[in-house]
Design a protein with these regions (language model features):
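A short alpha-helix capping/helix-coil boundary motif
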Residues: 15-18, 27, 60-61, 71, ...
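Polybasic, low-complexity association/targeting segments
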Residues: 1-2, 154
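Non-heme iron-sulfur electron-transfer modules
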Residues: 2, 6-24, 49-85, 97-128, ...
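Asp/Glu-centered strand-loop micro-motifs enriched in Gly/Pro and often flanked by an aromatic residue
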Residues: 18-42, 72-73
Length: 434
């Protein structure tokens, strides 16, 4: 008899991703595991509202001859896999059968395994490979001669139709702006003597698309007498490639990042990234993939979400809470990849310290989810997923705020009214009157 009760009251644990195991890429073994897990999901259906994967699975079952998983053609399993964008919410917030439960369900990592097999078989579209290469694309698109053309073409309806055909970017999807003066060019070194030392992993998005938000983070940290450095010569965190199933690239990027990050960790620096997905990658995912690497564990322990670090300053009486009033009403969308870090509601807590700021919270997925929200095959679904958040915007809402700027931009874009979106750290900077 199982020692675990229905619903699993034990604290969830997670097993390492055994991607080097010979059975990991065995398609028959994969299909057997998919059938087992799909049957468990079929009997539960608690996750039906999270994303498109689960409705796709349940529709396949309900429309089969047997009304069971055994009636679903295994060739159709791919339809379920393709709708998963590895948000991790099912594992962290819904599933009652995650380890240590006997049934050992890890739906996201099972989907990752399926994606990895698809990638190994050469079934991944070239356009998807391009879209999951933000560092390479950003390095080209942000060149001084090229960035004005790229930004102009992204606002041209006719050219967006061409981009949809060639690159698979949906013509109505919000796409980022590229800056020729990226983060590494606008960051200014400043010497501060402090026991609190932070090194910022700028991220691909911060370097090429949104350097302002990262500089806002730098300004807030320095205002609180924190020594801040920008980490030079880093690779992409690997999250986009992981969502593609390209584990070889994930490991390659990680190995290239380990040395510069470990140098800083050994020098006593904490690490921060402005994008929740990048933080999640270093905190949670890479330790599961490179579980034998002790340096990855040390890097994971040193990595902080920006507001998690500000909370650390509060605990150490090293945080300035003398904010000016901001008379605005905001919709704060809690980013999925921040939620699943299980670090607590630090952003909400600190925004609550700002006088007169009215914070309305939407703890639901934005639907953006990396490339899912921009691809022509899935953009329509992303709008549907994010619409419950967008509907929370009222005539009184002044701003959409999200720790994931891309998620916030997506919500603002699909809303029925024009509204701006910013990172919450920019609100904190405003409240400091910097």
């Amino acid at each position: 008899m199982s020692k675990f009760k229905e619903g699993n009251l034990e604290a969830p644990t997670r097993h390492p991703l055994n991607w080097k195991d010979k059975d990991f890429y065995d398609e028959d073994a994969l299909n057997n595991e998919l059938e087992r897990v799909f049957d468990i999901c079929h009997g539960c259906r608690r996750c039906v509202s999270l994303c498109k994967s689960f409705p796709t699975l349940f529709d396949l079952i309900d429309e089969s001859e047997t009304f069971e998983v055994d009636g679903v053609d295994k060739a159709d399993y791919k339809k379920v896999v393709d709708q998963c964008y590895l948000c991790d919410l099912c594992y962290m917030s819904k599933c009652p059968y995650v380890p240590p439960h006997d049934w050992n369900v890890d739906f996201p990592h099972l989907m990752l395994r399926a994606k990895a097999i698809q990638f190994k078989k050469g079934e991944t579209k070239l356009s998807h490979k391009v879209l999951t290469s933000p560092q390479k694309v950003g390095a080209i698109a942000s060149k001084p001669i090229i960035s004005p053309v790229v930004n102009w073409s992204n606002k041209n309806k006719t050219l967006r139709k061409v981009t949809q055909k060639v690159l698979g970017v949906h013509e109505n999807a919000v796409v980022p702006t590229y800056h020729s003066k990226g983060l590494s060019k606008v960051f200014v070194e400043e010497s501060i003597e402090s026991q609190f030392k932070v090194a910022i992993f700028g991220t691909c998005y911060g370097e090429y698309n949104d350097p302002k938000t990262v500089i806002d983070l730098v300004d807030v940290l320095r205002h609180n007498n924190v020594e801040v450095r920008l980490i030079k010569k880093t690779q992409c965190c690997g999250m986009p490639k992981m969502e593609l199933g390209d584990l070889d690239s994930v490991v390659k990027y990680a190995n290239e990042n380990i040395e510069p990050l470990m140098e800083l960790v050994n020098d006593g620096y904490k690490l921060i990234a402005p994008i929740p997905s990048c933080v999640l990658m270093f905190k949670n995912e890479l330790p599961m993939i490179l579980h034998e690497n002790i340096n990855i564990k040390a890097i994971s322990d040193a990595f902080f979400d920006p507001f998690e670090y500000l909370s650390l300053l509060i605990e150490n009486n090293h945080f300035d809470d003398k904010f000016k009033a901001i008379d605005k009403e905001i919709l704060y969308q809690v980013a999925c990849h921040q939620r699943v870090q299980n670090i607590g509601a630090h952003t909400k807590k600190i925004l609550g310290l700002i006088p007169d700021l009215d914070v309305n919270i939407a703890e639901r997925c934005s639907g953006h989810d990396g490339t899912y929200g921009v691809r022509k095959e899935t953009h329509t679904y992303s709008v549907k997923i994010g619409m419950p958040v967008a509907k929370k915007i009222t005539d009184n809402t002044d701003l959409v705020v999200s720790d994931c700027v891309m998620a916030g931009n997506h919500v603002a874009h699909i809303a029925s009214q024009e509204i701006d979106s910013i990172h919450p750290i920019s609100l904190v900077k405003l409240a400091y009157d910097l």
